Amino acid sequence: MLPVLYTGLAGLLLLPLLLTCCCPYLLQDVRFFLQLANMARQVRSYRQRRPVRTILHVFLEQARKTPHKPFLLFRDETLTYAQVDRRSNQVARALHDHLGLRQGDCVALFMGNEPAYVWLWLGLLKLGCPMACLNYNIRAKSLLHCFQCCGAKVLLASPELHEAVEEVLPTLKKEGVSVFYVSRTSNTNGVDTVLDKVDGVSADPIPESWRSEVTFTTPAVYIYTSGTTGLPKAATINHHRLWYGTSLALRSGIKAHDVIYTTMPLYHSAALMIGLHGCIVVGATFALRSKFSASQFWDDCRKYNATVIQYIGELLRYLCNTPQKPNDRDHKVKIALGNGLRGDVWREFIKRFGDIHIYEFYASTEGNIGFMNYPRKIGAVGRENYLQKKVVRHELIKYDVEKDEPVRDANGYCIKVPKGEVGLLICKITELTPFFGYAGGKTQTEKKKLRDVFKKGDVYFNSGDLLMIDRENFIYFHDRVGDTFRWKGENVATTEVADIVGLVDFVEEVNVYGVPVPGHEGRIGMASIKMKENYEFNGKKLFQHISEYLPSYSRPRFLRIQDTIEITGTFKHRKVTLMEEGFNPSVIKDTLYFMDDTEKTYVPMTEDIYNAIIDKTLKL
């Protein structure tokens, strides 16, 4: 009996070791799933309360519990939770009394990062008014489109943006829109001021009755897609979704003693929903900068004693491109939270700036699915959790890049891809994973839905992203469906090509896209390149490099050297104009190169080469 008992005990002792060997991420997977389940349980309980519990309620509690704690840091200014609470009370009262706003009235903010953005937002929450976050880089037609599609009644704008406001003011006035500068004076006829009105009212708490009709499905904020391929769409973010935006901050281990430093624009979900709201939920401090500056980034981190930084897109690469300094590791940053980080930049960043825990995630502003790389595997955007998938029904399906649609079988249903293959990410639309769509009509919302996916009547959210899941269940971003192009019968992922080209020593930044060629099917690869300072272009070196790492069909046949590469406010490359301009040297003033297979180098693009391509006397 004793030998059997000892054998059983030995087996129990060895079980954790065996599980670790066979399933090295099991404990992390279980822990992450339990955290998500707990979050879902909490949100469900918040929805059942009357009134429903929102992010605003948490802020009010933080202001009562820790009134003197620093909440906002901006330049040399420090604002406590109590100060921001009182200022946002004044905002709500001024908008209510002087502007006549009532719950449900949408207000558009057109301004950069500053404390006023935060207390205006909190003031609108206290009124039950949704906020439309306008990108301060947009102008004219795009600005009017964004304003109109959310149904806003009021525009609050920074006086620094007066030229953009004056350009659209006649149209806004015709539509009965009230326009105000967030200032005490105005030099524009027809534009009033709001700060003088805020200054002149009481800072007493706002009655709950002013927002009594707010529910979990009430729109709280409209956040716009980046508009890399057309006019931006206004994603509807309700109070239910605001809660899930904070989960990434919680999952990355941010605590009340942390200082979160962000240079991301507050009109974007990363800064607003993850950074600011995550800060409020844990009771931390939020350090804000008006715009990203690579040269001032670490000085700011030291100034504010930042422990958490946010990044998106190419931001960390910009930091790695700055000249090295002896104090590169002299900071308190321990967590970096964001997305879009290439594996090579990840390695370089932690090697140079220290052992910072980088939490890469995959998500979209409007989407109903997200992943987090909680084991912090370099290069992955997340991890597919077996337990999570049982609840959040998502799949990768085959996608025809040329036809720009999912591949369906003989019965008309979508086809799942096996591990290791690239597929389109979709997620079933359910009560637990809803898709709330876009403001301004149902057409755009319906375009993001896939119907009859695996059976009649089912509906899935189409992420528009091509991903790959490896055999260890780590998830890798491949490309956007609109960015991937087809050449010589093969799919070409622009991100993959850009990563390879970007490894060449003289390349500072690269934007890859496909351009049409008359008389040819598909699109051929082209790369816009920004050169590093004090480096010269070397066509032979680039040819050798891409020939070693890329198949012939995905090598960029044309290069365009630019002084600056145009990006959106969230560091995404703009491609549409470049694609339209193509590779015609008589149209494009930038220096162009053509990949010459015979000479094994890139040669200057000439009219003769262009004409030979058009005449088909030069084979591509």
Curated annotation (Swiss-Prot):
Positions of AMP binding: Y222, I223, Y224, T225, S226, G227, T228, T229, G230, L231, P232, K233
Reactions catalysed according to its record: a fatty acid(in) = a fatty acid(out); (9Z)-octadecenoate(out) = (9Z)-octadecenoate(in); a long-chain fatty acid + ATP + CoA = a long-chain fatty acyl-CoA + AMP + diphosphate; (5Z,8Z,11Z,14Z)-eicosatetraenoate + ATP + CoA = (5Z,8Z,11Z,14Z)-eicosatetraenoyl-CoA + AMP + diphosphate
Enzyme's top EC category: ligase
Sequence ranges on the Cytoplasmic membrane side: 28-106, 289-620
E.C. no: 6.2.1.15, 6.2.1.3, 6.2.1.24, 6.2.1.7
Domain of life from the UniProt record: Eukaryota
GO CC, alphabetical: endoplasmic reticulum; endoplasmic reticulum lumen; endoplasmic reticulum membrane; peroxisomal membrane; peroxisome; plasma membrane
Annotated membrane topology: Multi-pass membrane protein; Peripheral membrane protein
Spans through the membrane: 5-27, 107-127, 268-288
Tissues where the protein occurs: Liver and kidney (at protein level).
Positions carrying Phosphothreonine: T577
Biological function: Mediates the import of long-chain fatty acids (LCFA) into the cell by facilitating their transport across cell membranes, playing an important role in hepatic fatty acid uptake. Also functions as an acyl-CoA ligase catalyzing the ATP-dependent formation of fatty acyl-CoA using LCFA and very-long-chain fatty acids (VLCFA) as substrates, which prevents fatty acid efflux from cells and might drive more fatty acid uptake. Plays a pivotal role in regulating available LCFA substrates from exogenous sources in tissues undergoing high levels of beta-oxidation or triglyceride synthesis.
Family classification: Belongs to the ATP-dependent AMP-binding enzyme family.
Name by which UniProt lists this protein: Long-chain fatty acid transport protein 2
Gene source species: Rattus norvegicus (Rat)
Gene: Slc27a2
